Design a protein with these regions (language model features):
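Rossmann-like NAD(P)H-binding beta-loop-alpha module
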Residues: 132-194, 205-206
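Rossmann-fold NAD(P)-binding glycine/threonine-rich loop
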Residues: 110-131
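Short catalytic-loop micro-motif centered on adjacent basic/acidic residues
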Residues: 82-83, 105-108, 131-134, 158
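N-terminal glycine-/serine-/threonine-rich beta1-alpha1-beta2 phosphate-ribose binding loop
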Residues: 2-101
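Conserved small/polar residues in nucleotide/adenosyl-binding loops
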Residues: 287-291
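ADP-ribose/adenylate-binding Rossmann-like module
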Residues: 99-115
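Short, ordered loop/turn segments at secondary-structure junctions
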Residues: 50-52, 110-112, 118, 136-138
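Substrate-binding/catalytic subdomain of NAD(P)-dependent oxidoreductase enzymes
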Residues: 184-281, 286
Length: 291
């Protein structure tokens, strides 16, 4: 295919914070790698921000920066919108407006997907567009699309996984090195593996939102993460780890959801003792894994 015939996929992005800046850099640096896979060149046409001056310093071409959402929503050339704003609003309204405008939407916003996923998916279906949220669950592990494909042929009865890398890092270090929770959390923060305010991770809220998304998917109904029993790892001590090791087990923070008759669900996030024959026993440090 000649350069004249080369197809261009034009993208709009909502937000240019930490995640958005990362997406921008990937799109800029991976053009050659993406071209043979997509059969097209990707062009980031517009980025919606609040602070133009701050955002302009992060990009090569400041003309792609805008404070007007309508510039993205009303641009017929923009086929895909990447939402990296975070939070529920105005992200929710923007996503719905983009779908109604005939654009496909990609997000990693697990808070929004967990609470409003059903409504957004309905809007996507109504408009014949894709709403993709693979990155909102289990990071780099492609779990959402395989679940969709499995659901076409059969019903999934149960899903269990380690869905938060920060807590798994902490528990692995506590298990292998005999370190305290506070000491490992501090190390994780210094290494950039954990936020300064790590409540969402260590209290299990992040994993809870993710299992809510997966529960909604396997059941076909909206599952609110507030309705799921959630217990984090802040109360786990060095003594607990020694006790688990003496029993030939290790402690992992598991998120689990199981379907019962009548499409009833039981979902839970809690620390569990696993024996070596458990498929998640050897998932260590920052790795996450569904099973």
């Amino acid at each position: 295919m000649s350069m004249a015939e080369e197809r261009v996929i034009k993208i709009g992005m909502l937000g240019l914070g930490t995640v958005g800046t990362g997406v921008y850099k990937v799109l800029k640096s991976q053009q050659e790698e993406m071209l043979p896979k997509l059969g097209a060149r990707v062009e980031l046409k517009k980025i919606l921000v609040r602070n133009v001056e701050k955002a302009a310093a992060k990009v090569d071409d400041p003309s792609i920066i805008t404070t007007s959402f309508e510039e993205i929503a009303n641009d017929p050339e923009i086929e895909i919108v990447v939402e990296v704003m975070g939070g529920k609003q105005p992200a929710m309204n923007y996503i719905l407006a983009c779908l109604d405008a005939g654009k496909n939407v990609v997000t990693a916003n697990k808070d929004l997907v967990a609470s409003e996923g059903k409504k957004i998916l309905a809007a996507a279906k109504r408009n014949g567009k894709d709403f993709l949220y693979e990155a909102s669950v289990a990071g780099g592990i492609p779990i959402i699309r395989p679940l969709y494909e499995c659901l076409m042929g059969e019903q999934i009865q149960e899903i269990t996984g380690i869905l938060n890398g920060t807590t798994n890092f902490i528990l692995t270090k506590m298990d292998k090195e005999g370190a305290s929770f506070d000491a490992v959390l501090k190390e994780a923060q210094e290494l950039g593996y954990a936020e300064r305010n790590s409540e969402a991770d260590v209290e299990g809220y992040d994993a809870c939102r993710k299992i809510a998304i997966l529960s909604s998917l396997i059941s076909g109904q909206q599952v609110d993460f507030e309705d799921i029993y959630c217990e984090g790892i802040t109360e786990i001590t060095v003594e607990d780890m020694k006790y688990a090791k003496a029993m030939g087990t290790t402690i992992k923070l598991l998120a689990s959801s199981r379907r019962y008759a009548g499409n009833r669900l039981h979902a839970i996030v809690a620390p569990c003792m696993l024996y070596p024959d458990h498929p998640l026993y050897n998932v260590c440090l920052l790795y996450t894994s569904p099973s």
